[in-house]
Regions:
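Conserved small/polar residues in nucleotide/adenosyl-binding loops
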Residues: 117-123
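Short, flexible coil/turn micro-motifs enriched in small/turn-prone residues
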Residues: 15, 22, 68-69, 77
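Active-site-facing substrate-recognition patch
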Residues: 2-62
Length: 123
C-alpha cells in the first residue's frame, strides 16, 4: 500500500491534484480536488494508486460483493479496483442530480457494494 506522501507525490507529478477552493457536486467544499482524467493519462502511476485504494478497501471492508463506481470520471478507477480485487464492478450515473443505476445494471437484494463519489486529498 502506498504511503499518503507517495500517493500525493504521484498525484502532483501527474498534475491530477488540483489545489484551491472547490465546491464538489455533493455541495461539500474542499481545498483539493483529484482530477482522475489527468491521473489516468499515466497508466503505470494510475495502477499504483488504484492498487493502493484496492488494498485499503480490502482492509476496511472485509465482506462485499461488488464495486459501484460513479460515472464518468470514476468508471476506469472502479474497473481497475474491481479487477485487482476480482469483484464485479458496475457504475451509476447522475439523473436529475441523483445517482441512478442505468444500462441494465442491478444490485441483487442482500448484496453489499463499496461505493465512492469523492476522493478527497488532504495532507
Amino acid at each position: 500500500m502506498l504511503s499518503h506522501k507517495k500517493s500525493l507525490d504521484i498525484l502532483r507529478k501527474t498534475n491530477a491534484l488540483l489545489e484551491g477552493h472547490f465546491i464538489l457536486s455533493s455541495g461539500l467544499h474542499s481545498s483539493k480536488y483529484i482530477q482522475c482524467a489527468k491521473l489516468l493519462s499515466y497508466p503505470s502511476k494510475a495502477e499504483k494508486i488504484c492498487k493502493s485504494l484496492a488494498l485499503k478497501i480490502k482492509k476496511n471492508f472485509r465482506k462485499f460483493d461488488l464495486i459501484l463506481a460513479p460515472a464518468i470520471g470514476g468508471i476506469v478507477i472502479g474497473y481497475e479496483i474491481g479487477r485487482i480485487l476480482k469483484k464485479e464492478t458496475i457504475f451509476c450515473e447522475r439523473v436529475k442530480g441523483k445517482f441512478t443505476l442505468r444500462r441494465g445494471f442491478k444490485i441483487k437484494r442482500g448484496s453489499k457494494a463499496v461505493s465512492y463519489t469523492h476522493l478527497r486529498a488532504h495532507e
